[in-house]
Amino acid sequence: MSASGEVSTARDYIGHHLNNLQLDLRTFELVDPNSGGSATFWTLNIDSLFFSVVLGILFLYVFRKVAVNATSGVPGKLQTAIELIMGFVDNSVRDMYHGKSKVIAPLALTVFVWVLLMNVMDLLPIDFLPYIGEHFFGLPALRVVPTADVSVTLSMAIGVFVLILYYSIKMKGIGGFTKELTLQPFNHPLFIPINLILEGVSLLSKPVSLGLRLFGNMYAGELIFILIAGLLPWWSQWLLSLPWAIFHILIITLQAFIFMVLTIVYLSMASEEH
């Protein structure tokens, strides 16, 4: 094979694995990834939606089953692991959230475990599920890491943003929240436009940074796995993929933890009365 042919094959391989399984909501037809068309507002990444929902259901099922069958005696391995996770999350909430709410701890647990499960999908062999999807179901493309899709991470961040607004208005009232936006940092009516711009940018930057941070790290990790699989011979891929997978375990756990911590911190800031 010529050098240009090898480059073309590697380019096609990498491009194929970066394509989502998309549904055009205007025609309700699957989008052909080879058509050269770009994604629009009316395009839905159904693979990201499918895997995120399935992993969310898996999380609820496993935790509910363990809670129902929990015993006060010697716990099993799964119950022990879940108790450790719940204790870790509960301690994190106690350290960072200083208000009183029965929602924050369950929310933090859901965010941490759900994001972690979606991140773990990046450890699967890069061709495993796409091969099954293509040869058994005729799917033109399939991406299995929901958090490597910016629409998923920003959707979760927008959910957190809605909670930030809710707790800000709940704790401070509409008047207090309005004063916070218009009379800080300069407490003078003449500076209301400047204050509004500064506080508005600060407020909007929270969901944007929250979503893009998770997306950027997971997209980069996924891309490295794809590059290893697409550019190296099969017999040498494990020399890089195995060490990277071991290191990536730390990354996916850390990113889930950071997303949870920032969620707690933002809600704690919103709940503080001034």
UniProtKB/Swiss-Prot annotation:
InterPro entries: ATP_syn_F0_a_bact/chloroplast (IPR045082), ATP_synth_F0_asu (IPR000568), ATP_synth_F0_asu_AS (IPR023011), F0_ATP_A_sf (IPR035908). The keyword Acetylation does not apply. The chain crosses the membrane at residues 43-63, 103-123, 144-164, 223-243, 245-265. Keywords: ATP synthesis, Cell inner membrane, Cell membrane, CF(0), Hydrogen ion transport, Ion transport, Membrane, Transmembrane, Transmembrane helix, Transport. GO terms for biological process: proton motive force-driven plasma membrane ATP synthesis. One of its GO terms (cellular component) is proton-transporting ATP synthase complex. GO terms for molecular function: proton-transporting ATP synthase activity, rotational mechanism. Key component of the proton channel; it plays a direct role in the translocation of protons across the membrane. This is ATP synthase subunit a. It comes from Photorhabdus laumondii subsp. laumondii (strain DSM 15139 / CIP 105565 / TT01) (Photorhabdus luminescens subsp. laumondii).
